[in-house]
């Protein structure tokens, strides 16, 4: 039923709670991680607790269509978290977030620092992207190649403009703060929310929309590069093929067999020109061009 990704414990394992996170499996291969954003978000938060020795963590992929899963979890959908020691199963996102929050607070882990400015910049980014995605996919139906943004009708271009405006605002915030993460030099809940969504926007933009995050948003790209060098993100990130398959299923788009047979790959590099600009600004001087 489940493929386990065990994060080894630091120190005395018996003194720390064991948290089992069940995440949705890939629609291509049930042994691989699926592209559910909330699953990755909670995985990253739990990884942050593991890294400093607060908790033991096991992550298991589950095929939500299997009879074993339906029987064991009675219709609940991933993410699901189990804390066996307390005989508790958390099936609601707010319950999972609440348990992680209390653990972080108990051990003084600054994972849930509140920042209205950062919150305002990132809220609705993904919603606006989904509106753009749905509108453009519908417009491009029957076309061999995605249409160019400049050729889109005004009612679709408005969604594109909103996405770019929000990306620009995040780029500006990062420029002002001069920090690796949104709130400073440590990852917080805002990064666990934003990093996976930016990655999905990038992968789906390039594969389905003929769209890329504007290359002049240098501080935003430096932030994306930080994601690609953050263990919590790397461990929890699905393959490109699984992200694309996830959205094609949502959009009812045809997936040919060749795509499902491809070896899984993960895009964790950025364009050379962008990387060069990042170096010039001294944002990541130790990174080599790929």
Curated annotation (Swiss-Prot):
The chain crosses the membrane at residues 37-57. GO terms for biological process: chloride transport; epithelial cell development; regulation of tube size. GO terms for molecular function: chloride channel activity. It is found in: Cytoplasm; Membrane. Its main location: cytoplasm. GO terms for cellular component: apical junction complex; apical plasma membrane; chloride channel complex; cytoplasm; lysosome; plasma membrane. InterPro entries: CLIC_N, Glutathione-S-Trfase_C_sf. It comes from the Eukaryota. Pfam families: CLIC-like_N. It is a single-pass membrane protein. Monomer. May insert into membranes and form chloride ion channels. Involved in the formation of the excretory canal. Required to prevent cystic lumenal expansions in the excretory cell. Not required for formation of the initial tube, but is required for regulating the size of the tube lumen as it grows. Belongs to the chloride channel CLIC family. The N-terminal part (1-55) is necessary and sufficient for translocation from the cytosol to the membrane. Members of this family may change from a globular, soluble state to a state where the N-terminal domain is inserted into the membrane and functions as a chloride channel. A conformation change of the N-terminal domain is thought to expose hydrophobic surfaces that trigger membrane insertion. This is Chloride intracellular channel exc-4. The lineage of its organism: Eukaryota, Metazoa, Ecdysozoa, Nematoda, Chromadorea.
């Amino acid at each position: 039923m489940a493929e386990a990704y065990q994060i080894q414990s630091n120190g005395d394992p018996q003194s720390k709670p064991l948290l089992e996170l069940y995440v949705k499996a890939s629609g291509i291969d049930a042994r691989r991680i699926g592209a559910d954003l909330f699953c990755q978000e909670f995985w990253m938060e739990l990884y942050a607790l593991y890294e400093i020795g607060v908790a033991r963590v096991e992550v298991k992929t589950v095929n939500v269509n299997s009879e074993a899963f339906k029987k064991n979890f009675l219709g609940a959908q991933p993410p699901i978290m189990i804390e066996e020691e307390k005989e508790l199963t958390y099936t609601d996102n707010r319950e999972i977030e609440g348990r992680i929050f209390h653990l972080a607070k108990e051990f003084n882990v600054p994972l849930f620092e509140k920042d209205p400015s950062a919150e305002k910049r990132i809220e609705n980014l993904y919603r606006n992207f989904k509106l753009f995605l749905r509108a453009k996919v519908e417009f491009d139906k029957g076309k061999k190649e995605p249409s160019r943004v400049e050729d889109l009708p005004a009612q679709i271009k408005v969604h594109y403009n909103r996405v770019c405006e929000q990306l620009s605002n995040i780029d500006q915030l990062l420029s002002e703060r001069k920090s690796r993460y949104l709130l400073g030099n440590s990852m917080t809940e805002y990064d666990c929310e934003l990093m996976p969504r930016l990655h999905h926007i990038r992968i789906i933009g390039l594969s389905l929309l003929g769209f890329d995050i504007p290359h002049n948003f240098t501080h935003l790209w430096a932030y994306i590069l930080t994601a690609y060098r953050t263990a919590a993100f790397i461990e929890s990130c699905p393959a490109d093929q699984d992200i694309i398959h996830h959205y094609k299923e949502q959009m009812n788009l045809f997936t040919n067999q060749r795509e499902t047979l491809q070896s899984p790959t993960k895009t964790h590099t950025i364009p050379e020109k962008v990387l060069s600009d990042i170096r010039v600004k001294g944002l990541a001087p130790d990174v080599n061009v790929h």
